[in-house]
């Protein structure tokens, strides 16, 4: 009986973990002696000035378990000549055969439409579904990038300023949508109020180190 109790009290292994590690970008040390763990189910905001290491840390997190991560980069990275539909669908390419993907590129297939259309509707992109993404606004392009991540249906979402190009109200709604669809979320955010509202844990980066790591509720007290 006591053995089972002891086993149940052991915390789960961290999803991500760094122990006294150095993270570099283009040969330059960005974060030094980094010790950090993130558990499954956490919603973490990375805050800090430009160049503090948020993007570098997200890249390192992604490299730890790439097959489990839906990734939303700071620059949407869309294919401009393709439609919103096709750019969202790109997140699901690995789930289908090459032949299926080629046919769907020429003419959207019903099965693919049934998956993409609800995502586009949630993102407010249903009217732009068959517009080429070079015709979209910056905010619409960013929402398309989020859609490409959502369609992957992975447990972890990593986002580098994923709502920087939309207004505060839209950003809040998009971040809620992201959190509803992923068990674990790590976001680089510049809006501290937004970070406190959406995330359960805040990590602050400055001068190559973690200078803040606290529950959101503690910082709002």
List the predicted regions and their residue ranges.
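H-loop/switch region of ABC-family ATPase nucleotide-binding domains
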Residues: 189-190
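A short, surface-exposed alpha-helical micro-motif characterized by mixed small hydrophobic
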Residues: 195-197
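Catalytic Walker B motif of ABC-type/P-loop ATPase nucleotide-binding domains
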Residues: 157-160
